[in-house]
Design a protein with these regions (language model features):
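Binding-site signature for planar aromatic cofactors or substrates
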Residues: 1-149
Length: 149
C-alpha cells in the first residue's frame, strides 16, 4: 500500500509505464530531515507554501527572508516566521482551518528541489525560535520529505 500515491496517481503511472520509477522515488521519501536537508533548508532565501482552505481550495504563497529564516527545529519539524504581507492572511487562515501544507524549496543554481508535506500549526512568536518583528511562527511536522526531480 502506497503512502504517497492514491488510485488516480497509480492509474496515470500505469498508463505511462512509470510505476517502477514512482515506487523508487517513494522509497526515497522519509519522515525525518537529514544533515543535507537541514543545510539546504536553512540556507534557502525563499520557499513556496501550499495550503488548503476549509472548502478544499488550494493556494500557494511565496515565503522569503534572509537565509536561516526557516529552521529545522526537530527531527521532523520546521519553524518559520510569519510577517504581515498583504493583510489577507490566506496561509494562516488555511493552516488554522485544515493544517495540511506542502512546501517546495528550490535552488536554481544547484539545481536542487526538496518537497516537504506535513501538518502545520500557528504558534506565538516566543520561545527558542523567536524571530524579531514576526507576528507568529508556523511549526510544521513533516509526514513526507522527498527530493523533487
Amino acid at each position: 500500500m502506497s503512502e504517497l500515491y492514491g488510485e488516480a496517481h497509480r492509474a496515470f503511472q500505469d498508463q505511462h509505464g512509470t510505476r517502477r520509477l514512482a515506487d523508487r522515488l517513494e522509497s526515497l521519501a522519509r519522515t525525518e530531515f537529514d544533515a543535507n536537508d537541514r543545510a539546504f533548508i536553512e540556507s534557502a532565501p525563499f520557499f513556496f507554501l501550499s495550503t488548503v482552505d476549509e472548502r478544499g481550495r488550494p493556494t500557494v504563497s511565496y515565503k522569503g527572508g534572509a537565509p536561516g529564516f526557516v529552521r529545522v527545529s526537530g527531527a521532523n519539524e520546521l519553524t518559520f516566521p510569519i510577517y504581515d504581507g498583504n493583510g489577507m492572511f490566506l496561509s494562516l487562515g488555511n493552516i488554522a482551518s485544515t493544517a495540511q501544507v506542502g512546501l517546495l524549496f528550490i535552488s536554481f543554481e544547484s539545481p536542487r528541489r526538496l518537497r516537504v508535506q506535513g501538518v502545520a500549526r500557528v504558534v506565538p512568536n516566543d520561545g527558542p525560535h523567536h524571530s524579531p518583528g514576526a507576528m507568529y511562527l508556523v511549526q510544521i511536522v513533516a509526514s513526507e520529505i522527498f527530493v523533487n526531480c
